[in-house]
């Protein structure tokens, strides 16, 4: 998703949905395939349809509202990805790995919610 999040077309669409301009990269978390499926099935996503730009085709993505340890975020489920269904890609306004001082192997709480709301600043 990093390549996509660097593109203004995705940034604009995600900002329109989430209210924040996403950092151009994702925090990738691993869970069980069943847990990911069960959690995401409980909330509605907002769909970004696939599109063409400068002769290239770009994948659609389902965007789910979430919070990661107090920070507004979005779970991104790309139609085309290098990861399996057990990997969750999370976009946020900031680089969550640095903001939350996350190390490989850390357990992270992700709350998937029913709607996006702005972070208070």
Task: Please tell me what each predicted stretch does.
Residues 92-98:
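Short alpha-helix capping/helix-loop boundary micro-motifs
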Residues 10, 91-92:
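Active-site glycine-rich loop that binds ribose-phosphate moieties when present
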Residues 1-84, 104, 110-111, 116-121:
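Long, compositionally biased stretches
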């Amino acid at each position: 998703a990093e390549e996509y999040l660097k593109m203004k077309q995705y940034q604009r669409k995600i900002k329109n949905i989430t209210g924040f301009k996403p950092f151009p990269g994702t925090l990738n978390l691993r869970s069980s395939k069943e847990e990911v499926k069960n959690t995401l099935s409980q909330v509605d996503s907002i769909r970004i349809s696939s599109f063409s730009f400068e002769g290239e085709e770009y994948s659609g993505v389902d965007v789910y509202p979430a919070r990661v340890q107090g920070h507004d975020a979005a779970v991104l489920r790309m139609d085309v990805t290098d990861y399996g269904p057990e990997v969750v890609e999370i976009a946020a306004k900031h680089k969550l790995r640095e903001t939350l001082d996350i190390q490989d192997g850390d357990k992270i709480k992700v709350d998937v919610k029913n709607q996006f709301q702005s972070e208070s600043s």
